[in-house]
């Protein structure tokens, strides 16, 4: 043990930082590279100083910028497809008290409206020598720049597990940060029930009052561009794409000749479709997240008895039994179209860009819980919530093919988890 520590200290002292700026391919929508002039390549001031690369706003919105050094490389993500914008990425490595290395990452997250009620979720992934990418679990991270982030600004992440990955001075390690807008749903009671009639599931138990702990749900459905980033990162590690995704009316992911994928023009912000339950779960595990349960989905639509939760009870829900996220008006009441449902009168023949009906969001501000795409939930089908054996999975929320009343908080449908449909997508929960 002592000898290993001495070797680590000796190796750390000898380590010379080698830097080469590499401009990666643009995010999944393009195959064109970008050449960085030599004068823009960051200089290393000392081995313990941050490495800085000038990143214009235009570049950070459109291109990945990889900084390849002996220990760490950083990806700058774009925010054009419901990833939150992360900029001014800087990194350094320092020894820990035990002599092993720790990696420090600092960055800015610029969305001005990040708050405790509408936080960001930031996750970190790494790859050693271009091998398989891996999620850095939150147990290996410290600082204010990962997991749930409740205010914008300058953030820091300390990765304590660097030494456990057997890095050496000749390795090239890429690090990628991505952020998702989440919505906080406070703990507390809410009205959960199933009523007979229409497409509603009459076999469900009526539960006039239920209680859930605090959870978070993505403000938007997962987009085509987000899912394409995932496909391009996992590469040959797994499946997740099928030929129907090339349909540019209902999806729009195009395979390239180099085993990568691109988003069809103009389709970045549309919800991903033709997704099985397993595909959705794999994407969310890639992020460190999960699918919402049926109960969470219904509470996200209706809101709790108190919108600030049972702990404070200062903001009573004026419509705790509302059938739709916006209230009790039908989706097409009085010629106002509140979600994307069957037909074209709402302005969309197929899916709509996520957030198109944001003024008709849920009491918490979650968009598109009614219509657009029906969404996978975590639950197996059963006659009571949360329980059941392997078989069908539940989808909620209605879709662009649903009649208006089927876009409510009550209606659910059963699907085999292998089903891939143009009317089904998903969103994240935590």
Describe the function of each predicted region:
Residues 81, 352-355, 359-362, 388-430:
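Disulfide-stabilized, aromatic/cysteine-rich ligand-recognition loop
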Residues 134, 194-199, 211-341, 382, ...:
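Active-site microenvironments of metalloenzymes and redox enzymes
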Residues 76-85:
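Bacterial Sec-dependent signal peptides at the C-terminal "C-region" and cleavage site
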């Amino acid at each position: 043990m002592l000898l290993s520590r001495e070797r680590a200290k000796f190796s750390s002292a000898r380590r010379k930082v080698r830097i080469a700026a590499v401009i990666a391919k643009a995010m999944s929508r393009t195959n064109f590279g970008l050449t960085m002039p030599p004068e823009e390549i960051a200089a290393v001031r000392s081995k313990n100083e941050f490495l800085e690369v000038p990143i214009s706003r235009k570049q950070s919105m459109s291109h990945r910028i990889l900084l390849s050094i002996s220990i760490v490389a950083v990806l700058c993500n774009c925010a054009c497809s419901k990833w939150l914008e992360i900029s001014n990425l800087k990194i350094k490595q320092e020894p820990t008290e035990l002599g092993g290395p720790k990696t420090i990452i600092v960055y800015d997250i610029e969305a001005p409206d990040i708050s405790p009620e509408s936080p960001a979720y930031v996750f970190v992934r790494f790859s050693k020598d271009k091998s398989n990418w891996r999620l850095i679990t939150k147990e290996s991270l410290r600082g204010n720049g990962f997991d749930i982030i409740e205010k914008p600004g300058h953030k820091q992440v300390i990765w304590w597990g660097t030494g456990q990955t057997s890095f050496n001075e000749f390795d090239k390690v890429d690090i990628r940060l991505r952020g998702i807008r989440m919505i906080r749903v406070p703990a507390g009671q809410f009205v959960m029930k199933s009523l007979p009639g229409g497409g509603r599931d009459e076999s469900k138990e009526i539960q006039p009052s239920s209680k859930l702990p605090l959870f978070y749900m993505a403000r938007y459905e997962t987009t085509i561009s987000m899912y394409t980033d995932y496909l391009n990162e996992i590469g040959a590690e797994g499946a997740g794409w099928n030929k129907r995704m090339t349909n540019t009316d209902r999806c729009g992911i195009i395979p390239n000749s180099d085993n990568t994928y691109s988003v069809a023009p103009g389709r970045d912000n549309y919800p991903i479709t033709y997704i099985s339950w397993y595909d959705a779960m794999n994407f969310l595990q890639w992020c460190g997240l999960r699918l919402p349960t049926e109960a969470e989905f219904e509470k996200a639509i209706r809101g709790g008895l108190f919108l600030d939760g049972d702990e404070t009870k200062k903001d009573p829900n004026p419509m705790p039994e509302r059938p739709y996220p916006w209230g009790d008006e039908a989706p097409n009441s009085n010629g106002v179209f509140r979600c994307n449902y069957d037909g074209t009168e709402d302005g969309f023949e197929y899916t709509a860009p996520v957030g198109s009906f944001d003024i008709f969001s849920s009491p918490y501000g979650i968009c598109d819980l009614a219509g657009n795409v029906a969404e996978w939930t975590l639950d197996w089908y059963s006659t009571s919530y949360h329980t059941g054996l392997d078989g069908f999975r539940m989808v909620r929320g209605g879709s662009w093919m649903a009649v208006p009343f089927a876009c409510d908080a009550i209606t659910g449908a059963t699907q085999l988890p292998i089903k891939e449909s143009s009317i089904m997508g998903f969103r994240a929960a935590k």
